[in-house]
């Protein structure tokens, strides 16, 4: 399918949530992406947000293939060895006491907002009124109502006002 045919096909079938760049990628290697014409691009976005894994690093593909043969995804309502092992590594590397796993960056932002509010509530009590969250201007944190509430870019926020008071 040509680039123009692919663009038209996508516009017909996919909800327009972002302005897309007129490039169609075919594959990646390391930190590079290649379009359908073979042009090489340095992937400054490193994939996308929470999935900044690069492309085909030694050992990475093999580890994914091995895990896919066992479990591709399982809810955190159940125990599984890879999650426990990853949690242990994160705790040791971060110095924190627990790891928190989510399925997306938006869930991570929502979890962080809730953790900050719960911390303030537990430490200072409801009456202290410590519920405000500091956010950066010109930021983007996701499309959920909580994430939009701390997004500092007005054109993302405006269509969904009034947001959650942060």
PLM regions: where:
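A glycine-rich helix N-cap at a beta->alpha junction
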Residues: 159-160
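Glycine-rich loop-to-alpha-helix module at the N-terminal edge of alpha/beta enzyme cores
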Residues: 40-126
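Conserved A3 ("GATE") glycine/threonine-rich loop of ANL adenylate-forming enzymes
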Residues: 106-107, 140-145
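Short acidic, glycine/serine/threonine-rich loops at helix termini
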Residues: 113-114, 143-149
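Active-site and channel-lining beta-strand-loop segments
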Residues: 23-43
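Conserved small/polar residues in nucleotide/adenosyl-binding loops
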Residues: 164-166
């Amino acid at each position: 399918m040509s680039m123009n045919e692919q663009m038209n096909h996508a516009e017909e079938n996919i909800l327009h949530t972002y302005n897309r760049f007129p490039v169609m990628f075919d594959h990646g290697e390391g930190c590079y992406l290649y379009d359908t014409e073979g042009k090489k691009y340095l992937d400054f976005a490193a994939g996308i947000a929470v999935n900044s894994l690069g492309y085909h690093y030694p050992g990475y593909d093999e580890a994914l293939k091995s895990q896919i043969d066992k479990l591709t995804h399982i809810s955190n309502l159940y125990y599984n060895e890879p999650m426990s092992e990853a949690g242990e590594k994160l705790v040791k590397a971060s110095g924190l006491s627990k790891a928190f796993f989510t399925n997306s960056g938006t869930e991570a932002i929502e979890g962080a907002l809730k953790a900050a509010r719960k911390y303030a509530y537990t430490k200072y009590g409801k009456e202290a009124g410590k519920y405000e969250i500091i956010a950066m201007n010109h930021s983007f944190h996701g499309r959920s109502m909580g994430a939009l509430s701390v997004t500092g870019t007005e054109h993302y926020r405006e269509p969904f006002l009034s947001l959650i008071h942060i």
